[in-house]
């Protein structure tokens, strides 16, 4: 079950916050306004957009950062094409793929694929996830440009974010006569965990509390398989049931998660 949140903004970020709230039909409060003490606050300020968990004495903050921290470390030392997600998608050598990530979340796997040369179109329906990811991309592009980091700049330029429901967006593409067919459709729907212990990182606990599990995830499979040119890849917790009950062509099983690969035809060399 999803928890409620409020959107708050400083004066310096009011215009972008107001634009976001209009897009998703959400109310906007300034930083001094009283509210109903919602546990979570989505904050727009001059530095970034972040999600604030107000329950602890020291509030916990969740934001997207492609420039420093764990994502920067993974970009530099993550194992390249040997990573499980890369193997499942089919990243290999100089092969350049267009990947549709129909459940982008906070963009972690999309970033890995973009680091390995793929062009990634990300679809995200949650207003909170979209706001955090869009801000992370915007800041990342600015910081990479300012630092003269051409490699990171090129990576982030290969990532495109669209606010929409993944299933609806794919069906619209199938109905369109001039849409581009992605080589691979990647699905990582939020699996409703029954305990917080199943979510190792505190940040992911917060994220799932606000976004909620994708209870309707099964509806993603049919349009994904119809739209993908070569394969559909589904990331699931290791013990989770198959998406839509569909048997995969092959499975890559890790310690806590697995990748179910549904092949349509062989990827080009």
Swiss-Prot record:
The keyword Membrane does not apply. It comes from the Bacteria. S-adenosyl-L-methionine binds at residues 124-125, 188. Keywords: Cytoplasm, Methyltransferase, rRNA processing, S-adenosyl-L-methionine, Transferase. The keyword Transferase applies. It catalyses: guanosine(1516) in 16S rRNA + S-adenosyl-L-methionine = N(2)-methylguanosine(1516) in 16S rRNA + S-adenosyl-L-homocysteine + H(+). InterPro entries: 16SrRNA_methylTrfase_J, SAM-dependent_MTases_sf. Its main location: cytoplasm. It is an enzyme of class 2 (transferase). Its EC number is 2.1.1.242. It is found in: Cytoplasm. One of its GO terms (cellular component) is cytoplasm. One of its GO terms (molecular function) is rRNA (guanine-N2-)-methyltransferase activity. Belongs to the methyltransferase superfamily. RsmJ family. Specifically methylates the guanosine in position 1516 of 16S rRNA. This is Ribosomal RNA small subunit methyltransferase J. It comes from Saccharophagus degradans (strain 2-40 / ATCC 43961 / DSM 17024).
